[in-house]
């Protein structure tokens, strides 16, 4: 049996739907909501309440052979929490370690932790990120994920459980939340955007590609105790992404040429330097390891 935490989230819903044909699947959710109604009837849903280092996982984890841990505190731009790092650590680090401990106690064979490409960093300089790069988390969210990775690795070395860590690039797909949703709204509401000269290289991963990789990691023997970066093979620029989103929404957004350096300066003056980095800098990911080691075959591009 496979336990998927956060099964009513964007990734979780797609994952449990994909897995149900080949595995017995159970999912945990904080509370029953409208999103749970969209889950397949064959998938058992267990309510755990808020995720913390005191969560009772007994019912959810009972009989599980594999745990795929998706649930966590998401990376939200303009987070207004007084101490975001503490909140991220409570959910993404401490609660994850607690779940891992429960997995060990219950004889789980493999624990798959969905981390973030942010662990590697938020900018590449002519060379794509690989699994061999030294981590350089540049946000509180990424730091909390990296701290979880380190502690999971230490704990796994002292147990018989197999650990797999996945660091996805920004995930896109139908009804994707977060930054993709923001950019999509901008692309559909603004007939003209100043991205005509933006030629950066950004890696993304489709929800379908990420789900197929997670499914491979459930059973593939070579995945044991490995870290994999998850991304589509071909990066796109912000200009290309806006054009794609505009096409999907059947609008006609025009990207006109405007100096990128001036947009960076304006963003910095407005306190939006991080947003400018997301729009204009490179963040390229090399997916070679997963393709070669696991035989993963991601469909490419925003097809």
Describe the residue ranges of each PLM region.
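C-terminal amphipathic/interface module of NAD(P)-dependent oxidoreductases
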Residues: 274-303
């Amino acid at each position: 049996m496979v336990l998927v935490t956060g099964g009513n989230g964007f990734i979780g819903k797609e994952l449990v739907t994909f897995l149900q044909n080949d595995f017995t699947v159970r999912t945990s959710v904080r509370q029953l909501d409208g999103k749970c109604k969209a889950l397949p009837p064959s998938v058992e849903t267990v309510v755990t309440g808020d995720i913390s280092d005191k969560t009772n996982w007994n019912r959810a984890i009972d009989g599980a052979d594999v745990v795929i841990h998706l649930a966590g505190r998401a990376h939200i731009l303009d987070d207004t929490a007084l101490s975001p790092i503490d909140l991220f650590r409570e959910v993404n680090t401490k609660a994850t370690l607690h779940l891992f401990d429960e997995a060990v106690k219950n004889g789980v064979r493999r624990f798959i932790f969905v981390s973030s490409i942010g662990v590697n960093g938020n900018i590449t300089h002519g060379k794509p990120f690989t699994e061999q790069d030294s981590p350089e988390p540049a946000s509180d969210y990424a730091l909390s994920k990296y701290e979880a990775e380190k502690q999971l690795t230490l704990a796994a070395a002292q147990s018989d459980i197999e650990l797999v860590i996945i660091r996805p690039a920004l995930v896109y797909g139908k009804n994707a939340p977060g930054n993709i949703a923001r950019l999509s709204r901008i692309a559909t509401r603004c007939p003209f955007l100043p991205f005509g000269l933006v030629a950066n290289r950004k890696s993304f991963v489709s929800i379908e590609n990420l789900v197929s990789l997670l499914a491979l990691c459930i059973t593939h023997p070579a995945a044991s105790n490995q870290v994999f970066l998850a991304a589509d093979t071909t990066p796109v620029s912000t200009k290309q992404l806006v054009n794609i989103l505009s096409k999907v929404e059947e609008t006609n957004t025009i990207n006109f040429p405007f100096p990128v350096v001036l947009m960076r300066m304006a963003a910095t003056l407005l306190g939006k330097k991080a947003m400018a980095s997301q729009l204009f800098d490179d963040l390229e990911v090399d997916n070679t390891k997963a393709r070669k080691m696991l035989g993963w075959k991601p469909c490419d591009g925003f097809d």
